[in-house]
Curated annotation (Swiss-Prot):
Residues that hold Ca(2+) 1 according to the record: N57, D109
The protein's role, per its UniProt record: May function as a signaling molecule by regulating the trafficking of other regulators.
Domain C2: 24-142, 180-298, 341-463
A Pfam family matched in the record: C2
Highest taxon of source: Eukaryota
Stated name of the protein: Multiple C2 domain and transmembrane region protein 12
Cellular-component GO terms for this entry: endoplasmic reticulum membrane
Topological type in the membrane: Multi-pass membrane protein
Gene3D superfamilies in alphabetical order: C2 domain (2.60.40.150)
Length: 795
């Protein structure tokens, strides 16, 4: 199965950003707060309050007003909105400006559905336009009288044309979501979330003292459990009245650090029975805050013992004690993402943060050709979530559209450029009453590494949303983005940033193991899910966990081939140099051999002339000439772009390449390899023939790996065997004699010319001139091949 390269490639687009005001690529920061998105014009209608002034008809005094707003085929209403005690709603409705010519506002009596009055506004002449930072349009009272029913009402509202820059945009009820239940409209609104920063809590259980078992005739076998929130960890079992553990139990907590760690000592009486012999609880605020890489002091803590284990017959106070180190490790960065997709490396304490490096700005323009997981559903209620650091941004939900337009702009502070911005697009399942328990469905993700983004450029591209499954590579649509990174730091702070530590110093002074980092990352994801689920509107747990989902570690032949090709690309240049040198030795032609000897002779005996050539003006003139030729070649290659860059600083950068199909082995996909990659563990494949075929294929691959590993081990064992020969006295005597002869040659050849002659003779022998040529193996190589290895001992 071959993938279409053009279909899955990043395409360059040319939107009218910010109405094309100002430069496309400013050199000194953004021109406005919304210059990375296209301007969208909306008709805003703010319905604030209604007043009933009916005095003639007593029945008209009892009125439940409902406001209906109509523009073209779109209709919105306050029917399902909660009404205040003074008949107030204070709700903003937003309509697409191009959907009609006349805006109709109708006031009705809700129970009887009686029309009280109607107001029509012509869009072309009667509605003002407001562009921030202009002051907001003042609301007006509109008389809504009905002489037939004796209703005398007044409606307070305001109508104006605005854009997505307007302050009411995040709280507006858009016309495309008019069918959404009023209680669910909040789930369609854009929002920015700040996830609480995370911190490690280190509980080091050192030892116990004077522990008492429930069974007075038995030596206690105790382990310690510590619980913080929903996470419980325990130590190994240690026996004795004064057991020792010296074991770290590490938790993840979020700011503010207000939790409590509950510690219990469990006595293992036998294989099936256990009993608690002591408890202790400590608040996080009572622990030692470590703001530098260090260790907390070890202190003794009295344990609260159950009554059944207290010593009898002694009225004096007796307490078992537990020696522990309790600290909040604030000098670490808590990883919630995998290393490849990390967006933040800062420590918990702000005093250890590096200086601000720059600003990242993202304009989420829209999407095209979206496909959901449910093929029967023709439309999608989509929204985008962008995550960088602890700041999450969520766009509004565009209802019933496979090509939504958002045009929302967000920005982040950047402290490390070697990070990744993650954007995910999801199908909103929370906007209908019958979808209360449904989860939002992920459509796909786009990741942008910042180290590939050049500063002060605006990248306007359409990124494919790719989904790889057992059936192959599938395109779920395209996400249109405008990306810009602007440096804030200048001078030394900017140019020294690539050389500073990527992680806080504590990660290098007291590093955590990969196993610990993976376990703590799982804790961090759960805490983030819980914290963001408590916001309003909630960023659901399935969305957060999907955004923080790490790379799969399942076995994949496709990725194995990919990693081999990457490794081969890295060492290909070294292999090329080795092959060139080997070809000089092995060739029978005299020309390359004499060229090598000539170059060696010049560098050995004519170094004075080389020094004169380097320090002369001739070399400087040649370098300047080469620079001029290179610049002229670039200018003549693309004269239009050079002209724009010189006079307007306006050059369209090339699109960011986020996925290399050929590198990832996605240009020609083997479906069975994909099926094996996405198979569960243990395998859920029931066809024995397929399992046998996969097993035989893996055996063939591992056969080559086995032989390669065996050859490498054999050569390494022969090298070790050469050192073991030094244990024999005869070999040691010969080695000392050779060392003495070598020193004698060096001393005799200490004269500069003699040493150069010796080196030149060695080079002549090494390049194998015709009179030195011998196709038989060298003596040292013969000796090395005769050294023993453990391969002879294997059965």
């Amino acid at each position: 199965m071959a993938a279409n390269k053009d279909e899955f490639s990043v395409k360059q687009i040319f939107p009218k950003l910010g109405g094309e005001r100002g430069a496309r690529n400013p050199r000194y920061g953004p021109t406005s707060s919304h210059d990375l998105v296209e301007q969208m014009e909306f008709l805003y209608v703010q319905v604030i309050q209604a007043i009933n002034n009916s005095v003639v008809n007593p029945s008209a005094r009892i009125c439940c007003p409902v406001v209906e707003i109509t523009l073209g085929n779109y209709k919105s209403s306050t029917k399902n909105l909660p009404m205040g005690p003074n008949m107030d709603w204070n709700q903003v409705f937003a309509f697409d400006k191009s959907k009609g010519d006349v805006l109709s506002v109708t006031l009705k009596d809700g129970p009887t559905n009686t029309v009280i009055n109607k107001r029509n506004f012509k869009l072309a002449s009667e509605i003002p336009t407001r562009v921030p930072p202009d002051a907001r349009i003042a609301p007006q009272w509109y008389s809504m009288h009905n002489t037939e029913t004796d209703f005398y009402m007044e409606l307070l509202m305001s109508v104006w044309f605005g854009t997505q820059v307007d302050e009411v945009y995040p709280e507006a009820w858009f016309s495309d979501a008019c069918e959404v239940c009023a209680s669910r409209v909040i789930n369609t609104r854009p929002k920015v979330y700040l996830a609480p920063r995370l911190c490690y809590v280190r509980v080091t259980i050192v030892s116990g003292h004077d522990l008492i078992s429930k069974d007075k005739n038995k030596t206690p076998s105790v382990y310690v459990t510590a619980t913080l929130g929903k996470v419980a960890l325990k130590t190994k079992v240690s026996s004795g009245t004064n057991p020792s553990w010296n074991q770290d139990l590490i938790f993840v907590a979020s700011e503010p650090l207000e939790g409590t760690v509950y510690i219990r000592l469990i006595d293992r009486e036998d294989e099936q029975h256990e009993g608690c012999i002591g408890t202790l609880k400590k608040k996080l605020t009572e622990m030692t805050p470590l703001k530098v890489p260090s260790s907390a002091p070890a202190l003794f803590y009295d344990i609260e013992m159950p009554t059944e284990v207290k010593p009898a017959g002694d009225s004096r106070r007796f307490a078992s004690r537990l020696k522990m180190k309790l600290a909040t490790d604030q000098a670490y960065h808590v990883a919630e993402e995998c290393t490849q997709y990390s967006s933040d490396n800062r420590a918990f304490v702000k005093g250890l943060w590096p200086g601000l490096l720059g600003k990242l700005e993202i304009g989420i323009l829209g999407a095209t050709g979206l496909k959901g997981s449910d093929e029967k559903k023709q439309t999608i209620d989509s929204y985008v979530v962008a995550k960088y650091g602890n700041k999450w941004a969520r766009t509004r939900t565009v209802v019933n559209s496979v090509s939504p337009k958002w045009n929302e702009q967000y920005s982040w502070d950047v402290y490390e450029k070697c990070t990744v911005l993650t954007l995910g697009i999801y199908d909103n399942r929370q906007i209908l009453e019958d979808k209360n328990k449904a989860n939002d469905v992920p459509i796909g993700k786009v990741r942008i590494p910042l180290n590939r983004v050049q500063s002060d450029w605006i990248y306007t591209c359409s990124y494919p949303i790719l989904k790889l499954g057992s059936s192959g590579l599938k395109k779920m649509g395209e996400l249109q983005l405008a990306v810009r990174f602007v440096y804030v730091a200048q001078g030394y702070a900017r140019y020294s940033a690539p050389f500073r530590w990527m992680l806080p110093k504590a990660h290098y002074k007291s590093p955590l193991s990969m196993y610990q980092i993976d376990k703590l990352r799982a804790q961090a994801v759960e805490i983030n899910c819980a914290n963001l689920a408590r916001t309003e509107p909630a960023l659901r747990s399935e969305v957060v966990s999907d955004m923080l989902k790490p790379k799969s570690r399942n076995f994949s032949i496709r990725i194995s081939k990919d990693n081999f090709d990457r490794l081969y690309t890295v060492v290909k240049m070294v292999l090329w140099c080795v092959s060139v040198i080997a070809s000089v030795r092995s060739t029978t032609a005299c020309t390359p051999k004499f060229i090598a000897l000539g170059v060696s002779f010049v560098f050995l005996f004519w170094e004075y002339y080389i020094y004169w050539l380097v320090t002369s003006w001739l070399v400087a003139y040649c370098i300047v000439l080469c620079i001029v030729v290179i610049l002229l070649r670039e200018i003549l290659k693309s004269p239009r772009q050079t002209y724009n860059w010189l006079f307007y600083r306006n050059v369209t950068p090339p699109p960011l390449i986020l996925v290399d199909l050929k590198l990832r082995k996605l240009d020609s996909i083997n479906l069975d390899e994909l099926a094996e990659e996405f198979d569960s563990f243990p395998s859920s494949e029931n066809d024995l023939n397929i399992l046998r075929m996969r097993y035989d294929r893996l055996r063939k691959i591992m056969e080559n790996v086995m032989l390669l590993m065996g050859d490498a081990a054999t050569q390494g064992e022969r090298l070790l065997a050469a050192f073991t020969l030094l244990e024999r006295p005869f070999v040691l005597i010969i080695l000392l004699a050779l060392c003495y002869c070598s020193m004698l040659v060096v001393c005799l050849g200490w004269d500069l010319h003699v040493r150069k002659c010796l080196i030149f003779v060695f080079i002549c022998y090494w390049v194998q001139l015709p009179w030195f040529r011998n196709n038989l193996p060298d003596g040292s190589l013969n000796f090395f091949r005769r050294l023993p290895s453990n391969e002879d001992l294997m059965f």
